[in-house]
């Protein structure tokens, strides 16, 4: 044994998890919502994420920020969850180019939703339709991470992330306002 006190280690692990859960819990819920449309499956995914984050703090060595660590763990769990779901229920995911060329995938009911809810539903649908690597980049960007931090989480270069973000933002902007700024 390496001489570490397991009780002390568990206490540190619990404290780190409690802090991360308080700091990033809402972001983890948004991430689960982006990866899973089914409410029951989304709850399962969120539980899997929280368990994985808690377990991961036993290995956390501080080489990156806790924020980056939590997002990396959460996105890895979400991607694994999506892969398992696709094996059991195949679903057509879109590349960035296919998304740009396709029509609006949402069927909003304008009488039942406000404009903000409609926009959020459209954005969520567009994000869910993306292939997992693009979805991961968008979600991290929406959580306020910079390209360098996103690159750390995704295992890409900051330049590749910046390029992807530029393309993703352009596609999403076009999908929200296809005729330009004068057409709504």
PLM regions: where:
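A short, charge-rich alpha-helical start-of-domain segment used by transcription regulators
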Residues: 4-30, 40-43, 54
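Residue-level preference for hydrophobic side chains embedded in well-ordered alpha helices
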Residues: 20, 24, 28, 32, ...
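C-terminal flanking helix
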Residues: 25, 29, 50, 131, ...
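Arg/Lys-rich amphipathic alpha helix in sigma70-family domain 2
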Residues: 59-61, 72-94, 104, 108, ...
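DNA-recognition helix of helix-turn-helix
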Residues: 75, 79, 147-178
